[in-house]
């Protein structure tokens, strides 16, 4: 690995946009792999370093390149609500069908975490609301099972339903979303699912 490439990896993770630019100008490998197989763009995304990510994306970094645990800049930004970076990845060819190590699209962890603006962005971009991950769950299942039933999760469920999520898809154990919500006492979510 060249010095410029080492500098690029460090600068991206630190969010030092000027150092990123210098390293790229010095011929650094924009797709080099650092710790954990992270590209400079994945490293910048994981640290939510917007300016560094912007420079890398504009210089042609692959928004779909995955690290050793199957995170890409697109998937990670979606999963963590790094919406500015997410929008950039979507504008630069993010693969909406790409999946993480759990076989889920970016919409599933965004829903699990109650990240309403991120859920809206992903649905608007065309991510399939009914994709089923390796656990047998859709975004709707995750919002119910791993959420806390609070108002933000009610909004996520409403947004998923308005975005076309199918409330009749059963989880891997054959349980409907409405039954999952009822079992947890999430009355407001039950009401959304029954509307």
What are the language-model segments listed below?
Residues 10-15, 43-49, 76-82, 109-115, ...:
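Ankyrin repeat A-helix N-terminal signature
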């Amino acid at each position: 690995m060249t010095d410029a490439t080492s500098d690029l990896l460090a600068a991206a993770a630190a969010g030092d946009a000027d150092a990123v630019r210098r390293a790229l100008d010095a011929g650094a490998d924009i797709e080099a792999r650092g710790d954990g197989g992270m590209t400079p763009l994945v490293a910048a995304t994981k640290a939510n370093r917007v300016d560094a990510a912007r420079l890398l994306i504009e210089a042609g970094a692959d928004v779909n390149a995955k690290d050793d645990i199957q995170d890409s800049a697109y998937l990670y930004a979606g999963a963590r609500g790094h919406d500015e970076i997410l929008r950039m990845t979507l504008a630069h060819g993010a693969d909406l069908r790409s999946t993480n190590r759990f076989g889920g699209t970016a919409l599933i962890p965004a829903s699990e975490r109650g990240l309403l603006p991120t859920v809206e962005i992903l649905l608007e971009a065309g991510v399939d609301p009914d994709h089923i991950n390796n656990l047998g769950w859709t975004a709707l299942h995750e919002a119910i099972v791993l959420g806390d039933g609070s108002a933000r999760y009610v909004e996520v469920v409403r947004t998923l339903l308005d975005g076309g999520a199918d409330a009749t898809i059963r989880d891997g154990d054959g349980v409907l979303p409405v039954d999952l919500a009822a079992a947890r006492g999430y009355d407001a979510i039950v009401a959304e699912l029954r509307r």
